[in-house]
């Protein structure tokens, strides 16, 4: 694929849509106009604001305050970066010393920007109930995504979805924006590597890939500019396409998770400094902080939850997208040998259940699933640590439907069921919608509690109190509740090792 981006950046006034078969969003007249805005929890009292512009900024800045009409504080950085095939520069600024659980208003400094707002993070140990959404495997909507008119690309896997359907999951997130406090998205954003599924793109894959990325993050911005959007990698971030052992044919900017790193690498957190009074917890948290490698593996604390985001694609033995992985995508490694697993164990060992009783781990590829094949190398790497440190809930995607499993370990359901099990509860929330369609639920293992693939869907996780967690699945198009479950955990051990 021959790159045309050197000339595109030199001549930004050209009609962008002429560069590729897939349609680029138009370039604004003011090249400092912020687009593709996104925020993230960055620390106990801080958030990161990320956005893209069509020219590099010498000093990205954000004005902010607790009144929409009085943005009295300003934070700036020197962080404005790009990569070889991108038309845009990615900017990031961190807002620090925020009051907890407070509405802040902010304006990205530009002659063409508007005021938006967010809720600052809850402090670790705050036992106020709150909800989050799990949105995974979400792709672009429109002529270059799953709503292609008169094109039955992989439509055999969508038995009931009209191809002209609007992006119902993003619409539902917008309509319920006051009902959740942040989003976790462990992998598969945009599906830019599926440009190859659409014949019109075949002669200009480089531009098609970039155009789909720009479209998707513009579509997501009304959500991600207001709610912290916490992302980790999936297989569709790896390269310009998924044909095994051909990633060397991708342009340099479209290999090895380049856009994902460029977009999220400076906004995701590492690990929070422990607020536990226990010295061992502090030591483990400090160790995990040194080993964290955002946006691939990291953790954060929010109210009564400790959330760990892991990388199921690279950086462990036989990782599917690694240099010797089964997918042939030659991704990573992004850390030293065993760094991710050393981080994971240190981080889990640091969790003080008196402060953050709920321990949630999110990754892309599941090892328990219907309608697809579980990731055996992932299970070998991670499941033992899930059980040892008493992870309460595992959140995954990759298989394009919604699933819930009773607590299970090593393929055997926990006899305690949903009342104080030792084994983790697992969900798959991969039905948000993308060009590849939905996966049939197939044969269901005996520990399956719920499986749904008739329409696009997503999960809401509700932290009710220190001992009760609720997981709800919703149909995106209607908002109808599809499944609801409640997990009880006594959390009577401050540091759990079993």
Question: Each predicted region: which residue ranges?
Answer:
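Metal-dependent phosphoester/phosphodiester hydrolase catalytic core
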Residues: 25-438, 448-452, 460-498
């Amino acid at each position: 694929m021959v790159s045309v981006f050197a000339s595109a950046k030199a001549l930004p006034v050209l009609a962008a849509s002429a560069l590729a078969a897939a349609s680029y969003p138009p370039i604004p007249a003011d090249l400092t106009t912020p687009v593709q805005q996104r925020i993230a929890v960055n620390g106990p009292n801080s958030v990161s604001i990320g956005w893209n512009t069509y020219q590099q900024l010498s000093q990205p800045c954000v004005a902010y305050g607790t009144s929409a009409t009085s943005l009295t504080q300003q934070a700036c950085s020197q962080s404005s970066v790009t990569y070889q095939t991108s038309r845009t520069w990615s900017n990031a600024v961190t807002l620090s010393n925020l009051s907890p659980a407070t509405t802040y208003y902010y304006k990205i400094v530009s002659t063409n920007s508007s005021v938006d707002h967010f809720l600052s993070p809850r402090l670790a140990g705050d036992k106020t109930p709150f909800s989050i959404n799990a949105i995974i495997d979400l792709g672009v909507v429109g002529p270059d995504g799953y709503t292609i008119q008169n094109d039955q690309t992989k439509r055999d896997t969508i038995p009931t979805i009209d191809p002209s359907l609007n992006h119902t999951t993003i619409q539902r997130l917008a309509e319920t924006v006051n009902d959740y406090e942040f989003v976790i998205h462990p992998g598969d954003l945009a599906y830019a590597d599926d440009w190859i599924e659409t014949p019109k793109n075949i002669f200009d894959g480089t531009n098609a890939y970039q155009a789909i990325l720009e479209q998707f993050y513009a579509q997501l911005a009304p959500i991600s500019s207001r709610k912290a959007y916490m992302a980790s990698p999936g297989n569709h971030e790896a390269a310009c396409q998924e044909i095994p052992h051909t990633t060397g044919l991708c342009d340099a900017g479209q290999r090895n998770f380049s856009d994902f790193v460029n977009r999220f690498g400076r906004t995701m957190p590492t690990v929070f400094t422990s607020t536990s009074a226990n010295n061992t917890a502090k030591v483990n948290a400090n160790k995990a902080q040194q080993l964290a490698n955002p946006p691939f593996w990291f953790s954060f604390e929010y109210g009564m939850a400790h959330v760990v985001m892991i990388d199921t694609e690279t950086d462990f033995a036989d990782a599917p997208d690694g240099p010797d992985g089964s997918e042939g995508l030659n991704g990573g490694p992004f850390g030293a040998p065993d760094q991710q697993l050393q981080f994971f164990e240190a981080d889990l060992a640091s969790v003080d259940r008196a402060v953050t009783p709920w321990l949630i781990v999110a990754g892309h590829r599941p090892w328990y699933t219907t309608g697809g094949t579980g990731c055996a190398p992932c299970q070998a790497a991670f499941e033992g640590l899930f059980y040892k440190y008493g992870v309460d809930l595992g959140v995954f995607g990759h298989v394009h439907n919604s699933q819930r499993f009773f607590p299970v370990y090593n393929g055997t359901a926990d006899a305690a069921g949903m009342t104080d099990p030792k084994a983790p509860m697992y969900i798959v929330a991969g039905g948000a919608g993308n060009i590849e369609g939905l996966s049939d639920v197939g044969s269901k293992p005996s520990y399956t509690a719920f499986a749904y693939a008739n329409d696009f869907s997503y999960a809401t996780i509700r932290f009710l109190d220190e001992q009760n967690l609720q997981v709800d699945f919703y149909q995106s198009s209607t908002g109808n509740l599809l499944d609801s479950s409640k997990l009880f955990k006594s959390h009577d051990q401050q540091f759990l090792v079993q």
